[in-house]
Amino acid sequence: NLKLHNIGTHLSPQLTFCTSATKRGSFFSTLQSELEKILTTYVSDTSKILGVGISLPVIISSDQKSISYAEVINASADIYYTFCKYLNFPLLLFNDANSAGLAESWRQSGSEPIVYLSLSSSVGGANMNGHSIYTGKHGRGCEFGHMTIVPRGRKCYCNRAGCLDAYCCASILSDFTGGDLHAFFEEVKAGKNKGLINAFDEYMDYLAIAVHNLRMCYDCDVILGGYVGAYMSEHIETFRNKASELNPFEKDASYIKVCHYKTEASAVGAAVYYIDKFVKELGE
């Protein structure tokens, strides 16, 4: 997917495309040509482009040019340099959940700390303090998907057992409806399939444990994002009740919020990084 964003009061995605190219060289060539089409259509002066952000479900090294861990997708550690061959602009790599967290923080003006929990093909997250992303000493900060929720529980793709990812990634729900998450939530909404309703209730039970733990650790708002988060608005009160039952300090669970960006939050965040940097430099 490609998104183009400008600097303004609101960030407006101009175009999204999906490429079906599977071969490495073909993919990058397609990416290059599609980017050129977008720029020709929307940008009269490409010298004003601040940069290109590449958002990936991997752990990024501190230089934002190399990958230190990749299991969800097959990405080489030096993929940055391949991108550079095809994209003739300043370029950085971003963890997808961190980017999405930055997008949500920007949307909320960034004045309050937030925790963003991404519930997509894998589970990740971000801890935002203002527009600053906490990445940790080794770039593995906020890898919430690998918090242990059930000791010796289900096997995770990391080869450990009991990780949140094994209980709350989007496929836990979408697998019931042939990989179609929208269809799953439509079935739940219809209220006739008790099996799916019970599966979603169990999903929320595990998710509530995770969100409660995040509240205890960070004492700030927790935003539900990713593929599943986009569908949580209709179920948020039920979910808040589950989380509040675990909390010894407060019964008000309004700190749990649903993401603003229902799709492509990580793409927005990768663009916001450059915009935020530019705005800060103007103020210096």
Identify the role of each PLM range:
Residues 111-167:
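Glycine-rich phosphate-binding loop of actin/hexokinase-like ATP-binding domains
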Residues 1-48, 108, 152-155, 160-284:
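ATP-binding/phosphotransfer module of carbohydrate and carboxylate kinases, centering on a glycine-rich
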Residues 14-40, 47-113, 234-246:
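Glycine-rich phosphate-binding loop and adjoining helix at the ATP-binding site
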